[in-house]
Structure formats: C-alpha cells, structure tokens
C-alpha cells in the first residue's frame, strides 16, 4: 500500500476519487495519521449530493464522526487500481533484487520506475503519466 505522502502527490497532480466499496482512504487529521479506512456498504458508504460526495459512517456508535466530505479524505489507491489507471501505457511489472520495476510507454519511449513496494512503483509511473498529460 502506498504511503500517505505518495497518495497526496497523486491527488495534487490531479487524480480524482469516486469512492467505491473496497477503496481505502485516510482522513486528513493529525490525530488519525496512519489510520486506514475502507469504503464498505456495511459501515462506510459514499452518498452523492449536488454539493459533492459525503462518506457516511454507518453503525459505528463508538465513532464520533457521522460523515466526512470526500475532499477531507485521502484516497489510498490499491496496486490493481494504480495499474488500471495506467491504462494502455502500462507494459509490465518485474521483480528486481531490491523490489519491483514498472515499465510504461510514454511519448514513444519506455520509462521504468523502481521501488521496494510494487504499489509505489505503480504510483510513481502514474505520476509521470499524469505529469506528461498536463504538460
């Protein structure tokens, strides 16, 4: 799973989140640093309104938070979601002695991104792809 800092970089680069069951997220509050939550039809559901998406915390009586604007949540994309977001640019994932290498096709060239964690290698590749699309 990618670190909050990497997820924040993705959001700042323009990656938008449409919450779905199974999605992991963090709450942008210092007292909840490092905590992960999962969107679930049983406990945390996205509710769509004209003003935006609200995450409703259902059946969590010990929780002092009833709902949260999606803008106050930080999506932590999973490895499969990151790979899907790379779309046709994705070439392959390879194991290296120090971790993983993700290869993408970008501007007619193969670009490689390495990290000890496969999810972070995917995220770095996606950041590069997003950066190239807005340049």
Predicted feature locations:
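Ampiphathic alpha-helical segments that act as solvent-exposed interaction surfaces
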Residues: 111-135
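Extreme N-terminal leader/activation tails
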Residues: 1-31
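Generic alpha-helical propensity signal that fires on short helical segments
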Residues: 19, 28, 33, 120, ...
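N-terminal segment of the canonical double-stranded RNA-binding domain
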Residues: 16, 35, 40-112
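Functionally constrained cores in energy, signaling, and assembly domains
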Residues: 4, 22, 79, 119-122, ...
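Short amphipathic alpha-helical segments
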Residues: 2, 74, 117-118
């Amino acid at each position: 799973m990618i670190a909050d800092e990497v997820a924040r970089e993705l959001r700042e680069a323009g990656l938008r989140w449409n919450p779905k069951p199974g999605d992991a997220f963090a709450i942008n509050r210092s007292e909840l640093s490092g905590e992960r939550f999962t969107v679930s039809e049983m406990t945390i559901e996205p509710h769509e309104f004209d003003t935006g998406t609200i995450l409703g915390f259902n059946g969590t009586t010990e929780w002092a938070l009833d709902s949260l604007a999606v803008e106050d949540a930080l999506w932590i994309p999973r490895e499969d979601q990151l790979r899907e977001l790379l779309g046709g640019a994705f070439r392959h994932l390879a194991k290296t002695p120090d971790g993983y290498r993700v290869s993408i096709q970008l501007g007619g060239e193969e670009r490689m991104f390495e990290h000890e964690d496969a999810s972070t290698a995917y995220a770095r590749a996606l950041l590069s792809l997003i950066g190239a699309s807005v340049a």
